[in-house]
Amino acid sequence: MNLQILFEEQTKLLNKINLEKKRYLYEKINWNLKSIGILGQRGLGKTTMMLQYIKENFSQTNNALYISLDNPYMQSLSLFEFAKEFEQLGGEVLFVDEVHKYENWSTHIKNIYDALTLRVVFSGSSILQISQQNSDLSRRSIIYTLENLSFREYLELCDIYKFDSFCLEDILKNHQSIATDITKHIKPLMHFKEYLQ
């Protein structure tokens, strides 16, 4: 296996990654856990979040590696053996994207968890396929779900305005003052039409 090629591909991806704008889930993930799953629909930013974490924490080292299992090269390898070799070469964290495209992926993740000290962060967009895997990851992995972009998050990511988030109870109690504050800063209906497109 030629890790150098994979690190070169990772460097190209990291060069395109912006660290200034992050999805809400980024700060909620405990990145120090041994096994983390990030689930969500396609195009929500799972890959970007993983690459942001690598860029922010490992950009000057080869201790973290991003791989995508929709890569034909990765399809031809044993994920467990790949992870084992990466760990032997000093790897600390393996980021595995598109896990649902790899047959028996959950067995490999389970074996990595049980046999190696390597941490693994995996993501996938086919929640149905992921939930149908038969290996018991529930005791080994913490699963986070990346939801669709909220209107509040859209406003922040587009640099329109950054509003605090509120729980439902606060909204029900203080809806008038919250609405008044919002309309002081933006015209919500104008931006909401853009958000829906």
What are these regions (language model features)?
Residues 42-43:
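Walker A (P-loop) phosphate-binding loop of P-loop NTPases
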Residues 38:
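Hydrophobic anchor at the beta1->P-loop junction of P-loop NTPases
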Residues 61-93:
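Short glycine-rich substrate-engagement loop in P-loop NTPases that contacts/grips substrate
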Residues 2-13, 132-197:
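Interdomain motor-coupling "hinge/lid" segment immediately C-terminal to the ATP-binding subdomain
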Residues 119-125:
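Structural recognition of the conserved hydrophobic beta-strand(s) that form the central parallel beta-sheet
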Residues 46-47:
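Conserved lysine of the Walker
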Residues 87-105:
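Conserved P-loop NTPase "ATPase switch" module shared by AAA+ and STAND
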Residues 13-31:
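Pre-Walker A adenine-sensing motif
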